[in-house]
Swiss-Prot record:
Note describing how the cofactor binds: Binds a second Mg(2+) ion via substrate during catalysis.
Gene3D superfamilies assigned to the protein according to its UniProt record, in alphabetical order: Enolase-like C-terminal domain (3.20.20.120), Enolase-like, N-terminal domain (3.30.390.10)
Function: Catalyzes the reversible conversion of 2-phosphoglycerate (2-PG) into phosphoenolpyruvate (PEP). It is essential for the degradation of carbohydrates via glycolysis.
UniProt keyword annotations, A-Z: Cytoplasm, Glycolysis, Lyase, Magnesium, Metal-binding, Secreted
Location relative to the cell: Cytoplasm; Secreted; Cell surface
A Pfam cross-reference name: Enolase_N
Name of protein: Enolase
Binding positions (Mg(2+)): D241, E282, D309
Protein residues bound to (2R)-2-phosphoglycerate: Q162, K334, R363, S364, K385
Residues the record marks as active site: E204, K334
UniProt record, GO biological process: glycolytic process
Database matches in SUPFAM superfamilies: Enolase C-terminal domain-like, Enolase N-terminal domain-like
C-alpha cells in the first residue's frame, strides 16, 4: 500500500518571485505528499547544486529542466519503490544522479521528491510529519532565532553582517517566545520610524534600515527589547549571522568599512561579546579560512555558540572533517544544501554524537512549505531560523509550530535556555 505510483513536478515561484520546484508523490493507498524546495542567496561553495535553465525565461532562473528530470528520469526510477523506506528512496536518487553535488539531476529536483515522499508516508499513516520523522520522542519545540534587522546580501543597506536576530530563550513555551518576538519586532519598527529610518523589509522579513554600523543595529534592538518590556540577556538574547564569506578577500575581512585580519576578527568578536548579550555567532569566519575558524573556536567556544553554515553545508562528510579540525560548536541545517532527507538526518545524528548544537534553517528564497517546522520538532533540534515576524512564507513556519505545540499538549517542551546552557555558566 505504500508503493509510489506517481510523481508529478511543476514550476512554481518562491518568495523572491524566482522559480522553484514543487513535487507531488502519490502512493498506492491514495495518500499523497507535496513539497516545495527553497533557494538561498548567500550560498556555500560546496552546497549541492540547484539546476537552473539559464535561458531567456525568468532571466535564466527557470527550473523546467529540473521539473522534467522529476517527471521523467526520477519518476521512472522511484515508481514502484516502497515509500516507507526513505533511505532506499534517497539512495536511489543519489545513485541515479551519480555526482558529488547532485549537478546532474539537480538538488532541487531530488530534494522535492525526497521531502514529498516523507510527507506522503506521514499522510498515509494519518500522523503529523514531525511524528513520522521522530516518533514518540519528538516533543521539543525549538527556540526561534528571529531575524529582525537584515544586512549583507539580504538587504540594500550599509550593514556588512547579514542577520541581526533576537532569541527569546527566556520564554516558558514556544507560543510565549513567538509573542515576545512579535512584540519586540513591532516595537523596533516604531523606534526606527521615530528616528527617521525606513521600515521596509528585506528578503527574510526583517527591517533593512540604513544604519552605519553593527553596534548601532544591536543598540536599536536592545532598546526595542527593553521598551517591549523584556530584559536583554535574561529574557531575550541576540544572535548574529556574519555570513563572513561575503566580505572576506585575500585574508582580510571588511566589516562596516573596517578591515580585519584573523586576529583582528577575533578581537572584534570579543568586543561584541563583552558589550552585548550575544549568544550565537553564525559563520563569523569565511568557509575558506580554516585557521580563522580554529582561532575563534579555540578562544570563544565556551562563551558563545559558533555556528557553521557555509562551513559545513549540511554535508556529513564535510561536517566530520570540520569536527576533526576543531571548527565551530554548532551546525546550521538546510535541507537544500545537501539535497535529501536521509543525508540531512545523518548530519543531524553526527551533530548529536559529537555534542554540536543543531539549528534547522530556512533559506532567503522561501515558500509556504512548512517542512522545516516539522523537521525541527521531529529531530528535537532545539533551535530554528525561519526569518522575521513578517512575510507569510516566514510566518507559515511559526504558525505550524504553534499547531504542533497545541497537538502535543502537555507533552510539548520548549527548548528555552537549556539549549544554550554551556554558554551561560
Amino acid at each position: 500500500m505504500s508503493k509510489i505510483i506517481d510523481v508529478k513536478a511543476r514550476e512554481v515561484l518562491d518568495s523572491r518571485g524566482n522559480p522553484t520546484v514543487e513535487t507531488e508523490v502519490i502512493l498506492e493507498s491514495g495518500a499523497s505528499g507535496i513539497a516545495i524546495v527553497p533557494s538561498g542567496a548567500s550560498t556555500g561553495s560546496k552546497e549541492a547544486l540547484e539546476l537552473r535553465d539559464k535561458d531567456e525565461r525568468y532571466m535564466g532562473k527557470g527550473v523546467l529542466k529540473a521539473v522534467e528530470n522529476v517527471n521523467n528520469e526520477i519518476a521512472k526510477a522511484v515508481i514502484g519503490l516502497d515509500a516507507s523506506s526513505q533511505t532506499e528512496l534517497d539512495l536511489t536518487l543519489i545513485e541515479l544522479d551519480d555526482t558529488d553535488n547532485k549537478s546532474n539531476l539537480g538538488a532541487n529536483a531530488i530534494l522535492s521528491v525526497s521531502m514529498a515522499t516523507a510527507r506522503a508516508m506521514a499522510n498515509e499513516l494519518g500522523i503529523p510529519l514531525f511524528a513520522y520523522l521522530g516518533g514518540i520522542f519528538a516533543k521539543k519545540l525549538p527556540v526561534p532565532l528571529m531575524n529582525i534587522i537584515n544586512g549583507g546580501v539580504h538587504a540594500d543597506n550599509p550593514l556588512s553582517i547579514q542577520e541581526f536576530m533576537i532569541v527569546p530563550y527566556g520564554a516558558e513555551t514556544f507560543s510565549d517566545a513567538l509573542r515576545m518576538g512579535a512584540e519586540t519586532f513591532h516595537t523596533l519598527k516604531s523606534l526606527l520610524k521615530e528616528n527617521g529610518f525606513a521600515t521596509c523589509v528585506g528578503d527574510e522579513g526583517g527591517f533593512a534600515p540604513n544604519l552605519e554600523s553593527t553596534e548601532k543595529a544591536i543598540e536599536f534592538i536592545l532598546k526595542a527589547i527593553e521598551k517591549a518590556g523584556y530584559t536583554p540577556g535574561e529574557d531575550i538574547a541576540i544572535a548574529l549571522d556574519f555570513a563572513a564569506s561575503e566580505f572576506y578577500k585575500d585574508g582580510i575581512y571588511t566589516i562596516d568599512g573596517n578591515q580585519y585580519d584573523k586576529e583582528g576578527l577575533l578581537d572584534f568578536c570579543i568586543k561584541l561579546l563583552e558589550n552585548y548579550p550575544i549568544i550565537s555567532l553564525e559563520d563569523p569566519a569565511s568557509e575558506e579560512d580554516e585557521e580563522g575558524w580554529q582561532i575563534l573556536t579555540e578562544e570563544l567556544s565556551d562563551r558563545v555558540q559558533l555556528v557553521g553554515d557555509d562551513l559545513f553545508v549540511t554535508n556529513p562528510k564535510i561536517f566530520l572533517e570540520g569536527i576533526g579540525k576543531g571548527m565551530a560548536n554548532a551546525i546550521l541545517i538546510k535541507l537544500n544544501q545537501i539535497g535529501t532527507l536521509t543525508e540531512t538526518l545523518e548530519t543531524i545524528a553526527i551533530a548529536k554524537q559529537y555534542g554540536y548544537n543543531t539549528i534547522i534553517s530556512h533559506r532567503s528564497g522561501e515558500t509556504e512549505d512548512t517542512f522545516i517546522a516539522h523537521l525541527a520538532v521531529g529531530t528535537n533540534a532545539g533551535q530554528i531560523k525561519t526569518g522575521s515576524l513578517s512575510r507569510s512564507e516566514r510566518i507559515a513556519k511559526y504558525n505550524e509550530l504553534l499547531r504542533i505545540e497545541e497537538y502535543l499538549g502537555y507533552g510539548a517542551m520548549y527548548a528555552s535556555k537549556e539549549e544554550f546552557w554551556p554558554f551561560l555558566q
